[in-house]
Curated annotation (Swiss-Prot):
Subcellular location: Cytoplasm
Pfam family, one: ThiG
Pathway: Cofactor biosynthesis; thiamine diphosphate biosynthesis
Catalytic residue positions: K97 (schiff-base intermediate with dxp)
Any one Gene Ontology molecular-function term assigned to this protein's record: thiazole synthase activity
Record-level GO BP terms: thiamine diphosphate biosynthetic process
Highest taxon in the source lineage: Bacteria
Function field: Catalyzes the rearrangement of 1-deoxy-D-xylulose 5-phosphate (DXP) to produce the thiazole phosphate moiety of thiamine. Sulfur is provided by the thiocarboxylate moiety of the carrier protein ThiS. In vitro, sulfur can be provided by H(2)S.
InterPro entries: Aldolase_TIM, Thiazole_synthase_ThiG, ThiG
Keywords: Cytoplasm, Schiff base, Thiamine biosynthesis, Transferase
Gene that encodes the chain: thiG
UniProt name for this protein: Thiazole synthase
Chain sites annotated for binding 1-deoxy-D-xylulose 5-phosphate: G158, A184, G185, N206, T207
Gene Ontology annotations for the cellular component aspect, listed alphabetically: cytoplasm
Amino acid sequence: MEDTFKIGGRELTSRLFLGTGKFSSNRLIPEAVRASGAQVVTVALRRIDLEYEEENIAAYVPKDCILMPNTSGARNAQEAVRIARLARAAGCGNWVKIEVITDNRYLLPDNYETIKATEILAAEGFVVLPYMSPDLMVAKKLAEAGAAAVMPLGAPIGSNRGLRTKELVRILIDEIPLPIIVDAGLGRPSEAAEAMEMGAAAVLVNTAIATAGDPVAMARAFGLAVKAGRLAYLAGPGETQEYARASSPLTGFLRD
């Protein structure tokens, strides 16, 4: 049986979401999408240009993918809501990744403005995936507000520092009855695999792929790592032990 999961009524087979913000050329995007196997691709609304197709990043996203605009640039809930509405009016569908950031140094999300935006947009029929700093109470409020999934950061955006929030993300996986999608900071395929081994529903990767020496090869590497991590989670890793345990008997071979 195929391992799938659902968001907003859509059944997904790929657990790797792909961001598009940092590719050196838009022409790399369709190649990276195909190599990664991603079905959900995020784009910033400010990079969607309906007048000039060459500059319109959405034109490079394969038509069979779910286009998920993000509200990058929003500083409060009102701005995030406005961006989401503009994206839907521009024909980008009703999926939206909420990003509300007022911190210009660390680019950490404003969880409370994110909750407000989620509640408004979910009530308007959007499939809302909020980007948030991992916090159990905030995640519960996002679920109550109508979020379709929760997207806790692994590390600050674009840092490639890995899963620095591991224990906090684990709590969300255990306690929140929504897909948990680790977003931001994952810099290596092994880190994506680690998130999946913990039980995350999916991961979103942008910088680590887009800024790699060979973005298409790195996209494939992340796709394989996500599959490996998910398979390991389903297989059920063995327990860790404090002391060594021999895998073969230590007695009864050369002596009684």
